[in-house]
Amino acid sequence: MLTVELKSRHKMPLYEQLYLKIRGLITDGELTEGDKLPSERGLAANLQISRSTVGLAYGQLYAEGYVEVRPQSGYYVNKIDKINSEKKEEFTDIKNESVNPEPEYEYDFSPFSLCKESFPYRMWDRLYRQCMRDKGEELFNLGERQGDLELRVAIAKYLFGYRGLIIKPENMIIGAGTGYLLQLLEHLIDEKSIIAMENPTYMQAYRIFSSLNRKVQPINLDENGLRVDELNLSEAKAVYLTPSHQFPTGVVMPIKRRKEILSWAAGEDDRYIIEDDHDSEFRYKGLPIPPMKAIDTGNKVVYLGTFSRTIAPAIRIGFMVLPDGLLKVYRKKLAFLACTVPRIDQAVLTEFILGGHYERHINKARKIYKSRHDKLISSLKVFGDKVKIMGGNAGMHLMVKFKLDMTEEEVVSRAEKSGIKLVGLSKHRIGAVSYTHLTLPT
């Protein structure tokens, strides 16, 4: 029986650790041609990990040719030629280091920290194998530039059923995450136009918009979200919003405020709303509020969504729905660009959605995050009136204001020394301001 050491508190997933350990045993000659690997069930029991974790590791070894599968028998080591030792020496000076290594924390309370336990490893692995078996040759051909039609149709059906949106698949563009799609959008909006943004905001979007010398107009928030009076006084031609769960404050924008912003957009032909439907799947009290796109009668809303938040950060698949006016600009200026998401990933996600697995995953994840959300709030209540909790009815994070004789920087620094990662509100603000607010994941 294989005995390898795996670290549960490690940034690398367990299946990847196991895959690398076994691969090392094969390449070092400790496991040789014809050696049989333990059964998935047996190794899982021996290492006290899930069978799906072992299955993913074995699947990766099989995909790379290190092992073969013999029907009704199991996994066996393939013949692997040893790498010439002289060649190995040529690489000894290369440092195996990340360019910008992230420090490891015992407790990560950054707002983009996700619960890995909710990821459906076994189902994702099964669908991957199924797609390779059923569509293998097709997936090696170039796909449609806006993303495979099957995936765009699947997403459109999901949005209709669960967000009340009527979306035309031809208006949808698939891309490797929201960041990439915002870069595309940057080229569709007149370069001289000002883009308004909530302040505080999602700083990755701010960096993208401002990277090409685009003028960005920060707009303050009140208890209902972005202030329309300030927006009306600005010269902005587009506004970036996260109305379902404002990032990072957690404010859920009410219908009245949404309609006011839609009225602003209707005031001029070249005005648009960029709606990032951030964390819309996770609402813990009351009925979900429909996205602005659902009440957009003037074809003014650019709608953005991503699966990186709901499934896993490594699933770099997002989508952007363009109004007809901007779709014409896209086809004129950027239609030559190929889709940045591998076709196999698109195929797996398509089956994941159409098979009902995504819906079940969201329901399971919502229960997990609701439980974590309630436990976090309960734990924070022991601080009494020294803590004010904001944005606690939805999303995967909440904001906490501390009444302490310390600056935000001091709180974050002291937490870091104790192995706790916290993120202060100033990290999300356009312009330098000091707070004692922190964003915490639920």
Predicted regions and their residues:
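Short, polar loop motifs at secondary-structure junctions
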Residues: 200-202, 426-429
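Residue-level detector of anion-binding/catalytic polar loops
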Residues: 215, 272, 421
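PLP-dependent aminotransferase class I/II
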Residues: 301-382, 388-392
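Conserved core of the PLP fold type I
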Residues: 131-133, 138-269, 281, 287-295, ...
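N-terminal basic, amphipathic alpha-helical segments
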Residues: 1-129, 140, 335-342, 350-353, ...
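General small-molecule cofactor/ligand-binding pocket signal
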Residues: 173, 217, 302, 390, ...
